């Protein structure tokens, strides 16, 4: 039954990504501006202006797009990344940092997801276009070292799998408006 349930979700996610893959990233083009709020266990610790720039670079049907991230101003912190098609019909893209780092990203429904590990931290970045004028950017990060490990036992006839949980140390969120 669990396998049927998992297969059902896999099928649904593939259908959702196929439904939106045709309009991505064209319908996301523009400059998205707002305030990025940074939180930890004590609450909000920082706010900074943020811009996401998405613009077509070349004229091919499934070409590259700018995917620039600006924190504060271009003079303060500008990351001129590019969005590169891998298998757009399957929702697969790469964010190319233009420095030998290129990270797979996945478009599922209205969200572009990028999940990676760098310098001991697990990071999940999501970009969600909620309507034609609004994009929500979120980052969840924490150590790649498990906070706890439970399960890995047997209860009656059922094998209980091992489950590792990971700490969240920072949450970032920005509601961006198309300029």
Per-range role (PLM):
Residues 19-31, 45, 58, 126-131:
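N-terminal helix-cap/turn-to-beta initiation motif at the start of protein domains
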Residues 1-23:
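Bacterial Sec-dependent N-terminal signal peptides
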Residues 33-39, 139-144:
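Generic short beta-strand segments
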Residues 91-179:
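Beta-sheet ligand-binding and adhesion/scaffold domains
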Residues 28-36, 48-50, 174:
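One face of beta-strands
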Residues 19-20, 51, 160:
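Short structured motifs
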Residues 30-32, 63-65, 133-139:
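A short hydrophobic beta-strand element
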Residues 42-124:
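Central antiparallel beta-sheet cores of small beta-barrel/beta-sandwich binding domains
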């Amino acid at each position: 039954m669990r396998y049927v349930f998992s297969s059902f979700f896999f099928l649904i996610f593939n259908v959702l990504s196929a439904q939106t893959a045709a309009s991505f990233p064209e319908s996301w083009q523009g400059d998205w501006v707002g305030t990025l709020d940074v939180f930890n266990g004590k609450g909000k610790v920082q706010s900074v202006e943020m811009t996401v720039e998405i613009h077509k670079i070349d004229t091919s049907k499934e070409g590259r797009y700018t995917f620039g991230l600006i924190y504060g101003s271009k003079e303060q912190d500008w990351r001129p990344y590019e969005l590169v098609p891998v298998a757009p019909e399957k929702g697969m893209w790469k964010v190319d940092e233009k420095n030998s780092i290129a990270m797979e990203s996945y478009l599922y429904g209205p969200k572009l997801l990028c999940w990676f590990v760098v310098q001991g931290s697990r990071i999940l970045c999501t970009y969600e276009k909620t309507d034609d004028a609004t994009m929500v950017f979120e980052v969840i990060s924490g150590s790649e070292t498990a906070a706890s490990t439970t399960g890995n036992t047997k209860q009656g006839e059922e094998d209980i799998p091992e489950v590792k949980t990971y700490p969240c140390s920072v949450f970032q969120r920005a509601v961006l408006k198309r300029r």
